[in-house]
């Protein structure tokens, strides 16, 4: 199969994997309602500088994903499909970019195609590329920067590579506008480890090898600096401190106690059995098999460092989530594909002595094609049937439909101490901002003002008098209560 045919096949498979049935289910879990709500609020307010949630600045990360989601809402309407488009395109571009760059590295079309296919069909990569959020964009930015860096510094060393360095800058720009300091640290730690290995191996320090990525990184940070300047214009130093220190350094060091997701240092070690499913075994066996070749094979060394250095960085961070491993997926796919290629050569060498090996060699195309189609069919089935079924437990639509029904009746519905997911879901589905109350005194005053006033609240236990429950809706493991003042029923 030619490289062109493979690339077209990958394009078709990736479009199927990332876009088919993308909008057949509602916003689910915690991240999707929150990010979609921020995007809807940006669309409604027309404030494209400061991301807001429930009319409050929300600066956990820079706003690239929210910009794209808000633009999609403006173009296609406020639907789950629209706000998932950015992640889906990020997944698609990551797969196609990996294939193209591996071919530029001189790898056979078969190896490049298998690596790209394994990336597209890693369970965590696939699922996160179909969800609202910034993680797919972060993975695209990090992989773009690292692949371009390796091409410019190793493959085309001592040759003009301005295009590759500009691609490197684009990757850094995407990753930093998606995740801030982490988007700079993840490719940065790999590049640092690579340059140290290069210096040790050649027993000399080449200053230009260090200065070149630094200069193009400065170029890449210009879009982030422009946004920070505009943010400063709207909110001053407090907003800059929140995005640069509290939500970046604070989350890494653990000093920001409200960030959450705190896990022990061994958290990611316990997640290794599921990190790169279904290709885990090939990844880890490949790392072991290639360990003695690393210093002689710069290509294998680079992708091993992509895994190890980023894994170490994430392990040292206080805030940990399984989704953060998504940026390691391209390197894992490359190592898995390279080891699969080694296994294929071993089977071919034994074909003369083993009937089973000979059968596999004779029918390898049919076997591989069938296996790939079965994997794709499995993911398509999950997208078509499993995700919509989860709506019964995870969708906020029944809750927001109830809010709308009360509003149609002339009731004034307000939120009491809403969680991020509740605030996001309410603004996304209602395409409007509900009033919010923070203190219990505000709640009492609101309910006493009119018998038509209804408060929506989340509670682990049923609210007690003087509150009266008029309805409740369960979303996942959380229960949301619609309450009025009990005194209204005393008459």
Per-segment meaning from a language model:
Residues 375-486:
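Short periplasmic/luminal acceptor-recognition loop of GT-C membrane glycosyltransferases, typified by
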Residues 341-382:
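Signature aromatic-anchored transmembrane alpha helix within multi-pass, membrane-resident enzymes
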Residues 15, 119, 169, 179, ...:
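N-terminal secretory/membrane-targeting helices
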Residues 322-325, 336-337, 345, 368, ...:
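Extended hydrophobic-aromatic, low-complexity segments
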């Amino acid at each position: 199969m030619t490289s062109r045919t493979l690339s077209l096949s990958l394009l078709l498979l990736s479009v199927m994997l990332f876009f088919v049935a993308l909008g057949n289910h509602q916003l689910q879990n915690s991240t999707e309602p929150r990010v979609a709500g921020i995007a809807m609020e940006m669309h409604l307010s027309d404030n494209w500088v400061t991301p807001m949630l429930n009319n409050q600045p929300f600066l956990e990360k820079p706003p690239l994903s929210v910009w794209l989601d808000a633009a999609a809402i403006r173009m296609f309407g406020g639907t789950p499909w629209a706000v998932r488009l950015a992640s889906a395109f990020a997944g698609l571009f990551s797969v196609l970019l990996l294939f193209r760059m591996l071919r530029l590295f001189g790898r056979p079309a078969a190896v490049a195609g298998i690596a790209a296919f394994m990336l597209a069909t890693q369970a965590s990569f696939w699922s996160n590329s179909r969800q609202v959020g910034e993680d797919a964009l972060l993975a695209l930015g990090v992989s773009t920067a690292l692949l371009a860096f390796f091409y410019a510094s190793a493959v085309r060393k001592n040759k003009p590579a301005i295009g590759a360095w500009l691609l490197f800058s684009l990757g850094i720009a995407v990753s930093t506008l998606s995740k801030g300091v982490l988007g700079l640290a993840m490719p940065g730690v790999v590049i640092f480890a690579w340059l140290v290995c290069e210096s040790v191996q050649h027993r000399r320090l080449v200053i230009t090898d260090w200065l070149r990525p630094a200069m193009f990184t400065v170029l890449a940070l210009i879009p982030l600096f422009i946004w920070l300047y505009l943010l400063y214009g709207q909110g001053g130093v407090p907003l800059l401190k929140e995005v640069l220190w509290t939500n970046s350094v604070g989350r890494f060091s653990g000093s920001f106690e409200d960030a959450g997701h705190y896990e022990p240092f061994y958290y990611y070690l316990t997640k290794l059995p599921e990190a790169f499913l279904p290709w885990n075994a090939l990844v880890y066996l490949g790392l072991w098999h290639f360990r003695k070749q690393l210093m002689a094979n710069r290509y294998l060394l680079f992708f091993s460092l992509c895994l190890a250095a980023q894994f170490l960085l994430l392990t040292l961070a206080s805030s940990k989530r399984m989704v953060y491993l998504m940026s390691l997926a391209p390197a894992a796919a490359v190592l898995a594909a390279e080891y699969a290629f080694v296994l294929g050569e071993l089977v071919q060498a034994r074909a003369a002595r083993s009937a089973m090996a000979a059968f596999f060699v004779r029918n390898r195309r049919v076997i591989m094609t069938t296996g790939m189609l079965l994997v794709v069919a499995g993911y398509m089935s999950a997208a078509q049937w499993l995700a919509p079924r989860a709506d019964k437990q995870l969708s906020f639509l029944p809750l927001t439909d109830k809010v709308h029904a009360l509003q149609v009746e002339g009731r004034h519905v307000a939120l009491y101490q809403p969680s991020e997911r509740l605030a996001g879901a309410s603004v996304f589905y209602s395409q409007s901002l509900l009033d919010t109350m923070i203190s219990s005194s505000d709640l009492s005053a609101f309910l006493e003002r009119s018998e038509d006033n209804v408060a929506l609240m989340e509670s682990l236990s049923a609210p007690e008098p003087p509150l009266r429950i008029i309805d409740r809706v369960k979303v996942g493991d959380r229960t949301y209560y619609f309450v009025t003042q009990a005194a209204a029923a005393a008459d």
